[in-house]
Amino acid sequence: MSATKLTRREQRAQAQHFIDTLEGTAFPNSKRIYITGTQPGVRVPMREIQLSPTLIGGSKEQPQFEENEAIPVYDTSGPYGDPQIAINVQQGLAKLRQPWIDARGDTEELTVRSSDYTKARLADDGLDELRFSGLLTPKRAKAGRRVTQLHYARQGIITPEMEFIAIRENMGRERIRSEVLRHQHPGMSFGARLPENITAEFVRDEVAAGRAIIPANINHPESEPMIIGRNFLVKVNANIGNSAVTSSIEEEVEKLVWSTRWGADTVMDLSTGRYIHETREWILRNSPVPIGTVPIYQALEKVNGIAEDLTWEAFRDTLLEQAEQGVDYFTIHAGVLLRYVPMTAKRLTGIVSRGGSIMAKWCLSHHQENFLYQHFREICEICAAYDVSLSLGDGLRPGSVQDANDEAQFAELHTLGELTKIAWEYDVQVMIEGPGHVPMQMIRRNMTEELEHCHEAPFYTLGPLTTDIAPGYDHFTSGIGAAMIGWFGCAMLCYVTPKEHLGLPNKEDVKQGLITYKIAAHAADLAKGHPGAQIRDNAMSKARFEFRWEDQFNLALDPFTARAYHDETLPQESGKVAHFCSMCGPKFCSMKISQEVRDYAAAQTIEVGMADMSENFRARGGEIYLRKEEV
């Protein structure tokens, strides 16, 4: 925890300096590589961790070494992870997907914005200093066309996005030759299909079946294609966003870049304060990962925070505004039905979802059905025109372990399954949001219920938190549940930071939440038996046994913390080549002793073997050459 608390002015200045001096930066001893596909422009970034050789013998003067293969890993950092790319936040990122979108010929540029709110913001000269300067001209589908990845998949079309994803999901594991590194324990996949090699056709088939989604708004061409589905690597989402009491555009852009650097596969902008529209534009134009939002938050701002004053018209305008900016997925709380609200009355913690409570209050005050449910087909029509995926929100998720798996939670889940089928009628991609607070023994039921009632659409959960007693450590309490539900089949995990239930996360909190959830996601991939998931673990274990300290730091999810903790005990440079670990010291290091035992055993085997051969030689008469019948 920081010893000195920065003022608001200092925080903004620090964030401004961060984005003004931003450069493409590689992790220690890593380099950016690209693997090209067969379709034009498919060039998939990965991070390759370079390793030092292993000492295998020789003398002090002439040591003998064996090279260790570089380890390729999935990289979400986009251009921010490539030192060869010049970064300019004022201009935004290169439009990677624009040629693919244009080549399909099914979109058209809009001469005027569809949202009245957007028109008003653009006409306000007072916002010029805040506004992102390089605004895109938004596109939408031509009349009678659908531009979603689900639509293309159902037509049998393998898009460049699908080929990009296939290469990315394989993580370059075909480059690894060592049998030691390729060794992997069998997993327990709970029905997931995990092919040894992911092809573009497999990606297309999973998307066509609704088991996976590719969040890829046609107005967010800067994003690098990624996929969310239980038959792929488990993904992690990070939440950022300003509020009425804290943060600024500079700080949110800083948190976006920071999130992608530390492994966020998607980022949700949950802004509720001033300048939501302008903040989101800066985020989208500088984001290499899909961006999600909860549109009801901004719609509520438009009616001065009074839930009862919300209207379908205000919400529709917000959807159009955000779709034309480039938001890749919307969280929509359309499953909070009027008849479900009384089911929460006996709960210990009631309705804890912000979106869920807004819609529950609206339903009760008007005594009408949820207008998101009533207008769901119109929502789907909008999404189909821009390829905005739907994340069907769990507005009635449990907010305490006591309320887990109750009637209200599962009633809403079943409704989300009904809405999924409606969205699929419009070729709109769908994932399902899940809890929440659930004790460990009750977690698996959430996954089985979702698979059965939501037709195997991808599941996306907040944790779940497995206990309620650890404020300040809820990244741990939820990381446990996240690892479990990821193993059972959850496709994406929404991170929880140490500030959960306590305050808004800062930059360091974002990192802590992401590292925790990258651990959970990776543990789930290992448990499922995802092909290649164990390569990095094996490389780390080999480096650890061989006392290759620099390689251990560099293979870590957080090399900087690993190095810092080691250096607290062994700060000298000699400590980084020492053949003992920093915890046990030279005489009690278990791995050093194991190496000595291995060397001794090998020597003993040779000695015993030579003695046996000597005895055999004497028994045969001591002849150098054997008779033919003795061979």
Curated annotation (Swiss-Prot):
Metabolic or biological pathway: Cofactor biosynthesis; thiamine diphosphate biosynthesis
Cofactor(s) needed for function: [4Fe-4S] cluster
Name of the protein in question: Phosphomethylpyrimidine synthase
Positions contributing to [4Fe-4S] cluster binding: C581, C584, C589
Enzyme Commission no: 4.1.99.17
GO CC field: cytosol
HAMAP family: ThiC
Catalytic activity as recorded in UniProt: 5-amino-1-(5-phospho-beta-D-ribosyl)imidazole + S-adenosyl-L-methionine = 4-amino-2-methyl-5-(phosphooxymethyl)pyrimidine + CO + 5'-deoxyadenosine + formate + L-methionine + 3 H(+)
